[in-house]
Structure formats: C-alpha cells, structure tokens
Amino acid sequence: MEVYLASAAGLLSWCGKWRKIPTPLAHPTLLAACGADVALADSVNRLLYRQGRVSTLPPGVEVLRCWRNQLLTLSSETNCLTLYDAHDYPLITSPAGIRPCDCAIVDCQVIVCGCEDGCLHIFSLPDLREIAAYPVPGCPMRVAADGRVLTCLSLLSPDPPQTLLFRLCLTSGDFAPVALLPGWCGAVAIADDHTIWAGVGEQLLHFPLDSVVPDVQLGEFGLIRFLSCQQSKLLISDPWAGRCLLMDTTPPSAPHQLYAGECGGCCFASCRKGTLPDWKASLNEP
C-alpha cells in the first residue's frame, strides 16, 4: 500500500518509508490519483502538473479530481467547476454555487457543495450541465459518495461553529440527518464497509452503518482537511496541526503519525512494481 502526500517538501510517497518524487511544483497543495498517475496542483501559485506538463490553474482552486483520464477543478473564487481535456487544457466551465468548496464524482455525475447558496448541485459529465440542485440545511462544505448515497458536512452556525452530518439519497431524494456536531467542517470519507469517518472541529469520529452515535471519537486534531479510506486503513491529513497520520480501522486503533510538517492533499495508490509512470522513477529521501 502506497500513500501520496502533497507537502511543503514537495510530492512525497510513503510505502514503508518516505520518498520524495521530483516534480516542477515546489509546494503542491492538492493531488488526485488518475489510475497509476498522480496529478498535482499548487493552488497558491496556480499551477497544475501531470505527465510532464505544467499548466495554469484558475484562482482559488479548492479541489482537484480525476474523472476517467480528465481532471476537474473547483474554484471558490471564480465559483466555477472546470473540466480539462486529455492534455490538461480547460474544456468546459460551469457556474457552481457560491464559494463552492468540495465535490464528489458518481459515475458520470459530479456533486458540488454550493456552500453559501445552501445547495448540493448535480452536474452531468462530460458536458457539465446542471441537472439538479438539492437545498439542504446550512452551508454544505464537504461531500463523499457511496454509490447513489451522499454523506455531507454542512455548517449550520459559524459562532459557535456547529456542523450537521447528514446523508442524501440521489435516487429517492431522502434526507437523513446523522448528527449535530460542535466545530467546523473538516473532512468526510466512506469506508469499505459503508460506514462514515468525519473530521469535525478538533475531532475524528466514526459512525457505524445506520447509527447516529459515534463508536470512535478521537481528539487533539487541528482541523482535518483530507481523509482517504482503503483496505481498512484511514489516511488523515491535518494541515492545521501540520501532520499526516495513518490508522487501522478494523478494529480502530490509535493513529500513527507518518509525517510532521506543512501538508495538504493525500491519497492511497498502488505500491506494485511497474505501476508508477516514468517521471517518478528517480526517488530521493525528502
């Protein structure tokens, strides 16, 4: 099992130990796994890098996703969702909410957290045509998809901050609140067993299937921004505390710190020989 991390030290890969992968981006903030490839974004300097190509990003990019072999970006500054062609040039741009800050891909659709407009927007791919908008309580800020069921974090109140965790079925339109939690929206992810992991405020919580009560509640985080689940492992990136952690989820155990320092997006990738593209061939310790 291999882990990728965007950090102040560059793109890092962990498979038993950390390696630095040479790229033109000195300080990547976001990443997206596209098969055996990894796309990187430096949202501060507005740079995108993939397969040896460097291109320009719109301002305020919050999210980088991969659909098939094409990239998607979501900008909270332009309020737009953008689909790129196979050479990473902007292909289609569509308005998507007010200060949108997260999205998830389900088959040939992308679900966008419209944030300040109070809606979850559904766009078709590849034409980025809006086909539905679901009004939800508060400002939806984080979303994860489990088939046709969305799990979301929505900010109900900023002072003091309160976050609503809820599920929404795209097939039936059924809305199901899970929990009202103290703190800011951080991150949400769905495990292989369809249970929920959520970072809210300074906590990491786990909700079993069909339960409104967490069976795991861990504290002492800054504000978790990225979560990724795979094969009973949970990868955690906590930029506010400046650390990346890994934990077993079955049964849950204490998170193990993998990296300390300024960090951003993270994801799992294959660790099998031969799956990495040529630009990753020269590996050095960070």
Give, region by region, the residue ranges found by the protein language model.
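An edge-strand/N-cap motif at the start of beta-rich repeat modules
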Residues: 1-25, 29-33, 286
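Conserved core beta-strand positions within WD40 beta-propeller blades
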Residues: 2, 37, 70, 109-111, ...
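Conserved beta-strand positions in repeat-built beta-propeller and related beta-rich domains
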Residues: 5-9, 40-45, 73-77, 112-117, ...
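Structural motif
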Residues: 10-13, 46-49, 79-83, 118-122, ...
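Inter-blade boundary loops/turns of WD-repeat beta-propellers
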Residues: 16, 43, 51-52, 76, ...
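A short beta-strand motif characteristic of beta-propeller blades
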Residues: 17-23, 52-57, 87-95, 129-134, ...
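Repeated scaffold domains used in trafficking and secretory/extracellular systems
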Residues: 26-35, 59-68, 98-106, 138-146, ...
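Blade-level signature of beta-propeller repeat domains, shared across WD40, Kelch, NHL, RCC1
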Residues: 230-286
